[in-house]
Amino acid sequence: MRIKKKNTSGNAKNFVTRSQAVRKLQVSLADFRRLCIFKGIYPREPRNKKKANKGSTAPTTFYYAKDIQYLMHEPVLNKFREHKTFAKKLTRALGRGEVSSAKKLDENRTSYKLDHIIKERYPSFPDAVRDIDDALNMLFLFANLPATDQVSSKITKDANEICNQWLAYVARERLVRKVFVSIKGVYYQASIRGEDVRWLVPFKFPENIPSDIDFRIMLTFLEFYSTLLHFVLYKLYTDSDLVYPPKVDIAKNKIISGLSSYILESETEENVLTATKLSEPTGETSNIDSETLKLAMKADENVDDTNPEDEQTENVETVELDAFQDNNKNKGDILAQPSQYESPVSTLFSDFVFYVGREVPIDILEFLILSCGGSVISEAALDKLETKDIDFSKVTHQIVDRPVLKNKVAGRTYIQPQWIFDCLNKAKLVPANLYLPGETLPPHLSPWGDASGYDPNVSDAEEEGEDDEDEDSEEGSGAEVEENVDEDEDDEELRAQKELELEAQGVKYSDIKDTEVKSKNKKRKAASTEAEEEKDLKMIMMSNKQRKLYKKMKYSNAKKEEKVENLKKKKKQISKTKEKLTKLEGKK
């Protein structure tokens, strides 16, 4: 029997430390991190760290040995090594003062692509759509950052371009389903091929970038996510018969920028335009065509009129056909044509034209209104645009964020921006009188609910329902009393007879009543103890892991209930203070 060597099986074999992985791949730590981000490999936590680290208890980062073996065959790894040698040659040339050779080296520097990694990690398109939440969050974050020494202007410009392409597609296809304005920014949710995609767009405020952020890792993620989104957008645009990348109207981009500057053309129109350009005749060919046409006309005039069929056909062409009108008054047989849009939210504002005030953020509202089928006129853009072609008589709603408006136009509905958000979340048009300028707005709640399960609107409805049930039960009990008066009288007669019999025997009726109440209490206690015993038995039958999970679940549920109760108490206090204030205002 051979003696088994130590640290050759189990955790010691399955796991590799980070320093061992870097040594095995022969790359720097920074390149190793980049490679792991590109390939989606992350650190693992072994069950027994001491065994995995071969007896050492020093804090280390572990990876699967198979993952590191998988990285050894990556083509990007060779590109990293080539870049390392290129950097050495470049520093040597610059140190010697050989500028021409340094320029040649810089021109021939190696570059790599992440296309094959995207195809490996996302074999199907739905897999890629499910994973673009983080990609969108990262790109919108960098699009909002100012250009610094760590983040160049090209990076922010490219990120902004990809974000606008995404928003332009979502707005054109009308895919937005939910929106929530929070302290961090605006959360959007869109339905892309049956998958719910949620992302965060920060507010366009001046950013103070902290100094303790490692931008190298963030830029690596940005590089991967931008490649992923290019793939996704190309697929979405081509499937919708649109040209990718979309063209930008330079004149509008200088004035307004945003979604209105993007021109989304279909590929069929593009092909027709290119075909017409290619088939434009030259001067010589046009002369030949005119000569041949003249000869053909002369030949037609000299032809003998001997064919009667031609005459008939000519007469048939000039005859006007009778118009048949549908006299059927019953329109029930006509089938309603299905809409090209799946959700009713897509056509929510299709009949409206919105005039957005200069104090309202146009980028948020323009995206939402266009996604719901509406039209937008921005007051901020009118200063730079010619207002001759704009028809202001078609404006149905004006969005303002001011407490008082001096001049109002007749025929327009004046609303605050929250009306757009609440209509979209509820998938219907809510009453506009609650959102008039200067009015106290209803609470803007998250459409995805609270983590603790608290919903103020639902709780109010439930409380009202409980009150109604109590009233119904009281009414029902009153009716039952009226119906069963005779039965109650019979019961009273029986009780009186029992009392007389017991008094004759020398026993008090009150003592018997007390014993009946005690027996009922005992039965209740017995039932509760039985239920507790059943719970204890179930707990005994559980494994240690299940028991711990059950205790954690009970603790979390108790915390949630406590939080909900506190919120309800706060709500009651706020409603009481509001009632007091209204009473005081009424007295004044």
Swiss-Prot record:
Pfam families: BRCT_2, Pescadillo_N
InterPro entries: BRCT_dom, BRCT_dom_sf, PES
GO biological processes: maturation of 5.8S rRNA from tricistronic rRNA transcript (SSU-rRNA, 5.8S rRNA, LSU-rRNA); maturation of LSU-rRNA from tricistronic rRNA transcript (SSU-rRNA, 5.8S rRNA, LSU-rRNA); maturation of SSU-rRNA from tricistronic rRNA transcript (SSU-rRNA, 5.8S rRNA, LSU-rRNA)
Highest rank taxon of the organism: Eukaryota
Compositional bias per record (Acidic residues), positions renumbered to this chain: 460-493
Alphabetized CDD domains for the sequence: BRCT_pescadillo_like
Any single Gene Ontology cellular-component annotation: preribosome, large subunit precursor
Limits of the BRCT domain: 344-437
Biased composition (Basic and acidic residues): 510-519, 576-588
Keywords: Coiled coil, Nucleus, Ribosome biogenesis, rRNA processing
Primary location recorded for the protein, binned into one broad class: nucleus
Coiled coil: 512-588
An annotated Gene Ontology molecular function: large ribosomal subunit rRNA binding
Location(s), subcellular: Nucleus, Nucleolus; Nucleus, Nucleoplasm
Region annotated Disordered, chain positions: 446-533, 559-588
Subunit structure: Component of the NOP7 complex, composed of ERB1, NOP7 and YTM1. The complex is held together by ERB1, which interacts with NOP7 via its N-terminal domain and with YTM1 via a high-affinity interaction between the seven-bladed beta-propeller domains of the 2 proteins. The NOP7 complex associates with the 66S pre-ribosome.
Family: Belongs to the pescadillo family.
Role according to the record: Component of the NOP7 complex, which is required for maturation of the 25S and 5.8S ribosomal RNAs and formation of the 60S ribosome.
Stated name of the protein: Pescadillo homolog
Source organism of this protein record: Vanderwaltozyma polyspora (strain ATCC 22028 / DSM 70294 / BCRC 21397 / CBS 2163 / NBRC 10782 / NRRL Y-8283 / UCD 57-17)
Lineage: Eukaryota, Fungi, Dikarya, Ascomycota, Saccharomycotina
